[in-house]
Regions:
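Non-catalytic beta-sheet/beta-sandwich ligand-binding modules that flank or precede catalytic cores
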Residues: 87-97, 191-199, 205, 252-295
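Intrinsically disordered, low-complexity segments of exported/surface proteins
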Residues: 1-32, 264, 271, 275, ...
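The feature marks proteins involved in alpha-glucan
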Residues: 15-49, 83-157, 186, 194, ...
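Extracellular beta-sheet repeat scaffolds used for adhesion and glycan interaction
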Residues: 76-80, 113, 119, 181, ...
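Short, surface-exposed alpha-helix to beta-strand junction/turn motifs within ectodomains of secreted
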Residues: 52-69, 161-175, 268-295
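Functionally constrained cores in energy, signaling, and assembly domains
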Residues: 1, 7, 26, 51, ...
Length: 295
């Protein structure tokens, strides 16, 4: 069985970072610019406060794998070189010319793998940052507290006036006076944004984007409901213009990957995916290829 091809949808309208003085927008104006061909890895917390004792060991689609810089474990890049930001610390890593995946781990001078093997999927040529939380979970955006979800809304025209969100599902304090939704914060990293408090063990959310300058059904920017059902794994959602898809990354890529397969019978295979909210069963069947390993 071969893995599915990543179902990718890119756009020239991928949002650029919007600078802001609002700390809730999760930006850090003091950071140095990211060089072309480089990805910045932000770490929320390191396994030790002694940064000089820790190293970042990298392989796969990097310009120079750590194994070419020196033997294990000394070929790793020392965290003594890491710089501070609002999230924690960060290191920049040069990528290969056509990167798809950066694999890494954090080790120490004794050669202990402290983080386990981790990977950053390079979702888009524009992707130049990734965030790693204290449990070494990797994100394509800066994660927010687990009891909230952030909806990011990108408009090509940049007009966020009178725009709001009407939401329901596993949320707290849902709006109830239609069509008076909750207003977006206009100056986020990826356009406008809204942080929504969630109920305990929240799984799903539904929402509508509203233009409160209009009346009747015209108040709905997109006529159909947006729905998402994997809040346990996802901290931020991304929508744009009148696109009907809810994306889980700021590059508007349908990041659906096969994570496991088990043959249940001669005619039946059970497949596991990263998520299915961004794709239809027809898309899966179209992209899926099953091959005989002996042929």
């Amino acid at each position: 069985l071969t893995e599915t091809t990543k179902l990718t949808e890119t756009s020239e309208n991928t949002p650029k970072t919007v600078s802001t003085n609002n700390s809730q927008a999760l930006t850090n104006a003091s950071e140095e610019p990211i060089a072309e061909g480089t990805i910045r890895l932000h770490f929320q917390e390191l396994p030790s406060q002694d940064k000089a004792s820790l190293g970042l060991w990298t392989w796969d689609d990097v310009e120079t794998p750590s194994s070419q810089k020196g033997a294990w474990p000394t070929g790793a890049t020392s965290f003594a070189e890491a710089k501070q930001d609002d999230y924690g610390v960060y290191l920049d890593v040069k990528l290969s010319s056509t990167p798809k995946k950066l694999s890494f781990l954090i080790n120490n001078a004794a050669g202990t793998n402290l983080s386990g093997d981790k990977a950053v999927e390079i979702l888009s040529p524009q992707m130049n940052e990734a965030w790693i939380d204290k449990d070494f979970q990797v994100y394509s955006y800066q994660p927010i507290p687990q009891d909230h979800v952030r909806i990011n809304y990108f408009r090509t025209d940049g007009d966020y006036g009178n725009k709001s969100v009407w939401y329901w599902g596993d949320v707290k304090d849902a709006p109830s006076n239609w069509p008076d939704g909750v207003n977006f914060q206009p100056n986020g990293k990826y356009g406008a944004y809204l942080d929504i408090p969630l109920t305990e063990a929240a799984k799903s959310i539904g929402f509508l984007l509203l233009d409160e300058s209009k009346t009747g059904d015209d108040v709905k920017i997109q006529a159909n409901d947006y729905k998402f059902s994997d809040l346990k794994k996802t901290r931020q959602l991304f929508v744009r213009d009148t696109d009907t898809t809810v994306y889980t990354n700021p590059y508007f890529v349908k990041d659906v990957r096969l994570t496991g397969a088990q043959q249940l019978s001669p005619s039946k295979i059970e497949l596991s995916f990263t998520n299915l909210d961004e794709v239809s069963s027809e898309d899966i069947l179209k992209e899926l290829k099953v091959t005989d390993k002996d042929r």
